[in-house]
From Swiss-Prot:
Database matches in CDD domains: RHO_alpha_C_AntDO-like (cd08879), Rieske_RO_Alpha_HBDO (cd03542)
Stored InterPro entries: Benzo_1-2-diOase_lsu, Rieske_2Fe-2S, Rieske_2Fe-2S_sf, Ring-hydroxy_dOase_2Fe2S_BS, Ring_hydroxy_dOase_asu_C_dom, Rng_hydr_dOase-A
Organism per entry: Pseudomonas putida (Arthrobacter siderocapsulatus)
Similarity section: Belongs to the bacterial ring-hydroxylating dioxygenase alpha subunit family.
Identification of the protein by name: Toluate 1,2-dioxygenase subunit alpha
EC number: 1.14.12.-
SUPFAM superfamilies in the record: Bet v1-like, ISP domain
Amino acid sequence: MTMTMHLGLDYIDSLVEEDENEGIYRCKREMFTDPRLFDLEMKHIFEGNWIYLAHESQIPEKNDYYTTQMGRQPIFITRNKDGELNAFVNACSHRGATLCRFRSGNKATHTCSFHGWTFSNSGKLLKVKDPKGAGYPDSFDCDGSHDLKKVARFASYRGFLFGSLREDVAPLEEFLGESRKVIDMVVDQSPEGLEVLRGSSTYVYEGNWKVQVENGADGYHVSTVHWNYAATQQQRKLRDAGDDIRAMTASSWGGDGGGFYSFENGHQMVWARWGDPKNRPLFAERDRLASEFGEARADWMIGVSRNLCLYPNLYLMDQFGSQLRITRPLSVDRTEITIYCIAPKGETPRRARRVRQYEDFFNVSGMATPDDLEEFRACQEGFAGGGMNDMSRGAKHWIEGPDEGAKEIDLHPKLSGVRSEDEGLFVMQHKYWQQQMIKAVKREQDRLIHAEGV
């Protein structure tokens, strides 16, 4: 019996508590420390549902490839000679060695360095080494039997590539739901769309992956954890009034209005109005955006900072800098984060400002990330003592469905918060996680029953 078989539905059901009448919104800290839950998450969330893989701009040319992970499984994405994108498990169909061992490159064919089998970048086995007299059976390499294993579901939305190793998942657009409209507001900043800029930062923190997924939409911690950044920015503002490359200030973040939106399938967003939107790289484009998309959407594109979580592994952040933040769980208490700066294509005159804003706050050597990582470590250490995490802040003014601001931009969240410090979005996200864990336990139980019956 596998370790996950010792997980009962009653245990899963007890991990997240929500009682509106009693004002209880909390979760047990075991959900961040139990290795049995981590095994289920890897199999049924990171390998068994849609997750973010890459952006199309990272595989721009024919024969380009890009490697990444889906849970515990290595993946690579290729653009073949016809310009079509494909995603495969990064393992030779012969004996399982990885084919692509660099982050990215350009190859029309991929030859395994173990036994020399060669595959096209469309996944077809082209040749095996020394086939003459090898004595392969007649069934060898028939009907694609030894081609590379494709990622079961692979799709793009506005240049963002997603995959699932399980076939029976909802269509991607249905999975993304209302969060697609937020993606649209970021992509539509340029007629040519977005591109990922060269360079990245990767780091590992000592904590569960869900801590980062929470924190990316946690407006409550900003003034406490990032007070030093806010103070530094205020000094810069006074000292460098004529600076062309101005970092966005955190000193009044959320003070000009903000809130959150919870969407279906664990997606969520925290937002806040900028006190100084004129420092945004896109500010000069406001008239064009208003003409194309209307005043309300143009206001959101420029005047509002937003952190959008595309559950479970991507944050699309458009605030102190513009970035993709990708979460990769390594173990129940270790998580790898990779961040990339993104920008509208063709933004050359304002590119420097965008990159400097990104580096200032978010880079691994920036003024915010190290502070966050220390809090993640401290949380994971504290979780060992058990107990409950409270998520009730703002409960008296959460709004079922869209608030007035969401209606102005035709956004229909499941829950709205009127302040960026409110915690209702964590309740919604962890309830979705709980539902996925219940489904996972049932699938594992059904699999065991089927195996015992054979």
